[in-house]
Structure formats: structure tokens, C-alpha cells
Amino acid sequence: MSFGEKLRELRGEKTQETIAQEVGVTKSAWAMYERNERVPRDEVKLRIANHFNKSVQEIFF
């Protein structure tokens, strides 16, 4: 499973816009992460992992 698929699964019923705001990225950046078109910076990976109470490794590797 790609990290984009994992992010979509973790997002659940929330909109991309809602999650993007909660994590502190733009909606377009979040959409690109889900489509595997862009890889988040390490700092953003950590914020995403913390938001979902997961490790960076669980989501991105």
C-alpha cells in the first residue's frame, strides 16, 4: 500500500480540506500527497504521524 493510500484511509470521512487545515498544509498539497505526486518534508511527515497517533514509519514506509 502506498503512503497516499494510507493517508486516504486514515483521513476517513473527513474532507481533504479539513485534514489539511488540521495538519497545517494546503489542500492542494494534501491532495498531491494522496495521489503520490509529492512527498511531504520530514517536518510535515512528523505532523501527519502525530495527528493520526501513528509513527512516521507506519505511514510512509
Give the positions of each predicted feature:
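Key DNA-contacting residues within the recognition helix of helix-turn-helix
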Residues: 31-32, 41, 60-61
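DNA major-groove recognition helix of helix-turn-helix/homeodomain DNA-binding modules
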Residues: 43-58
